[in-house]
Structure formats: C-alpha cells, structure tokens
Amino acid sequence: MTTHESGQDDPSSEDTVIVAETRTGTYTQQITAGRHQLIADEPAPTGDDAGPNPYDLLLAALGACTSMTIRMYADRKEWPLKRVRVTLRHSRIHARDCAECETTVGFIDHIDRSIELTGDLDHAQRDRLLLIAERCPVHQTLTSEVRVTTSLV
C-alpha cells in the first residue's frame, strides 16, 4: 500500500508502507510498515543478500495471512488445531504449460502453497480449513483484478 497525497506518508500510519534505499548495499532497501522495520535485498551475486527478496516478501505475506486466517477460524470454532505451517514457492511458467490458465501466451506467475495442519481434526474440519485458506485477504487480493497507480512526488 502506498499513498501519494502530501502528508500521508507518515511512517507510523498503519496503512502506509515506505520503502527507501539504504545505500549500504547494491540494492538493499529499508522497509517501514507502521512501527515495524524490515530489510529487503536481492540475493548474491546481484545484490548483497541482506534480507528477503521482493518475491520472498510476497510469499511471506500470503503465507502469514493464510496461517492467521486458518488460526482465527479454528479458534472461533474451538477446533483442536495445534499448529499451522504454510510452505510457498513462486515460479514463472510458460502459459502454454498451464492447463487451467486462460492465457496461452507468455509467462504465468505460479504460486504453490502447501498447508500443513497439526491437531486432532476430522476430514470435514480439514476440508473446511482448506476452503478458509482461500478467503485470506492477501489471497483475495492476489487473485482479483489489481490496479497499481504510480506517481512521482
């Protein structure tokens, strides 16, 4: 999320993320999200590998949101979910190699998400939690029409 109107780039604002070069490395970036600080970078040899790369952060957002959404639902239902673990991988594949894709030209971004649920859950509960994972807000954003507006300030 970014804002473009003056006065709305307050780093303490919960709905604003600011990314700025650190100039301590080739591509190292300081990320400020509310009161939280993160570092992003490109892996060596392109960058200095000082932090996760942008796709790692994208996958982390989806994985965290998925796990949190499942946890909230299971807790609300008082189901015996002990642990959620989400493993994600990003790849770019040829569109022609994607059987379920509408696009047949160029490349498709593909995210493989595996969810491990630990606890004494029955099959119906596990199936329901798999459906709930699809309702994670980050998943909804990634699978909806997204528009990014960019401006120079």
Report residues per predicted region:
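Extended beta-strand/beta-hairpin segments
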Residues: M1-A60, R71-V153
